[in-house]
Amino acid sequence: MSHSDLPLANAVPLDKIRYNDQGLVPAIAQDYLDGTVLMLAWMNEAALAKTLATGQVWYWSRSRQELWHKGATSGHFQKLLGIRYDCDSDALLLTIEQKGDIACHTGERSCFHQLDGHKSPPPADMLTELARVIGDRRDHPTPESYTCKLLAGGDNKILKKIGEESAEVVMACKDDDPEAIAGEVADLFYHTLVALAHHNVDLRAVYRKLGDRRR
């Protein structure tokens, strides 16, 4: 793959990127599906050029003082899908597809998996976070939880609620009530996420299908 064949590659003004006094620029890798920040590393001019030329992400290892092909050892390669630079041209944001869904050398999905020294999932978009909470309710049920009661009721209870919420979305739209529409769509999204959890369908599989729809 040539530099010009890579999506957005020609939009990166290599001569305008501002490197620090060590010849490096910080590069943030972000998951293309749910926006999770996966890692922060560094690039020099050679790493950025190699990334654009190959379509796979290369960094500069400050400890080893050499180019670092992400995933060359672990198999957790990063496929570059997009790249942006900030307003000062001294930081890069890489939109990537993370192979193996693991970016951190510890085996965690994201390097940002700790909060105040304690393990915590990285922040993501609202639907992803809600899906995570629902999955946690499924795996660690509590009797007072509405979500747990829905899951315990199985398809009959969950699908009945989806049908009810779908009808309420239709009625809110017919009434042209923006606030009601937002509320009913939120309820429909929530109950649909419960159905996904019940059937062990990862929300990112849905995101991939949505990505296919926009092509």
Curated annotation (Swiss-Prot):
UniProt-recorded Gene Ontology molecular function terms: ATP binding; phosphoribosyl-AMP cyclohydrolase activity; phosphoribosyl-ATP diphosphatase activity
EC number(s) per entry: 3.5.4.19, 3.6.1.31
Matches recorded under InterPro entries: His_synth_HisIE (IPR023019), HisE (IPR008179), PRA-CH (IPR026660), PRib-ATP_PPHydrolase-like (IPR021130), PRib_AMP_CycHydrolase_dom (IPR002496), PRib_AMP_CycHydrolase_sf (IPR038019)
Cellular component annotations (GO), alphabetically ordered: cytoplasm
GO biological process terms held by the UniProt record: L-histidine biosynthetic process
Keyword Nucleotide-binding: yes
Subcellular location: Cytoplasm
Recorded coiled-coil stretches: none
Annotated keywords: Amino-acid biosynthesis, ATP-binding, Cytoplasm, Histidine biosynthesis, Hydrolase, Multifunctional enzyme, Nucleotide-binding
Catalytic reactions of this protein: 1-(5-phospho-beta-D-ribosyl)-ATP + H2O = 1-(5-phospho-beta-D-ribosyl)-5'-AMP + diphosphate + H(+); 1-(5-phospho-beta-D-ribosyl)-5'-AMP + H2O = 1-(5-phospho-beta-D-ribosyl)-5-[(5-phospho-beta-D-ribosylamino)methylideneamino]imidazole-4-carboxamide
CDD domains, per the entry: NTP-PPase_HisIE_like
Sequence similarity: In the N-terminal section; belongs to the PRA-CH family.
Protein's name in the database: Histidine biosynthesis bifunctional protein HisIE
Organism whose genome encodes this protein: Synechocystis sp. (strain ATCC 27184 / PCC 6803 / Kazusa)
Gene: hisI
